Curated annotation (Swiss-Prot):
VirB proteins are suggested to act at the bacterial surface and there play an important role in directing T-DNA transfer to plant cells. Keywords: Crown gall tumor, Membrane, Plasmid, Transmembrane, Transmembrane helix. NCBIfam families: PRK13852.1 (NF010426). This is Protein VirB6. GO terms for biological process: protein secretion by the type IV secretion system. It is a multi-pass membrane protein. The chain crosses the membrane at residues 35-55, 68-88, 167-187, 201-221, 226-246, 251-271.
Amino acid sequence: MNFTIPAPFTAIHTIFDLAFTTSLDTMLGTIQEAVSAPLVACVTLWIIVQGILVMRGEIDTRGGITRVITVTVVVALVVGQANYHDYVVSVFEETIPNFIQQFSGSGLPLQTIPAQLDTMFALTQAAFQRIASEIGPMNDQDILAFQGAQWVFYGTLWSAFGIYDAVGILTKVLLAIGPLILTGYIFDRTRDIAAKWIGQLITYGLLLLLLNLVATIVILTEATALTLMLGVITLAGTTAAKIIGLYELDMFFLTGDALIVALPAIAGNIGGSYWSGATQSANSLYRRFAQVDRR
């Protein structure tokens, strides 16, 4: 029996997107319910204490009011599910993608990338099957060369798809843990964690912009050239020439794939997020511990 998926990229994208969306939405609601009651109680007590200290003159009035406003805004986002969705989730899942779509350099909607990859996959599958039927069962050299060209081509498609799909899924994961991370913004010691979380979301937003500008152009160019190149390859005189043509096709797709694979590093460097390498050096850590010792 031959089990095949007619549109593998679209099917995989739909399955993972639905699974993560359902699970993470449930987890987000659970997190907000768990932290809302103790957080509101602690913040209420903290505001009362702040008011007493301000009235006694032990805390600067302007600074105390600023802290109260900041804490109130953070708590409103963390506790209120509608507020968090309207002001945080919708910005990164709806507003930014819709805004970025207006700057597409190819006119190809980013959401159609799985369908474009499915079309290219189907076209090459037909060509691969025709060429495979011409190779004799005892011709080990041609079989090995053909399989190598086939797997390289599949690898280029899957790597481009993996980057595209990972951006959406990881953004959903970050947004799901947002209430816990934003709670840390209230405290000075954990404020850096919340800042890094925001930086990571900004990085994914930049990566989405780069994908929309670069990946759509690359994939549209590859889809346009693929039909012509497959026609030339299948009309070649010998099987060896067809296999060589497949490797030339791989080189073309690897060039475009290199541009797409480089996009996460570019977005990380621009966004200045934690995973892009913004870690402390050994000298920086040494200076920090030295300051602690002197105190």
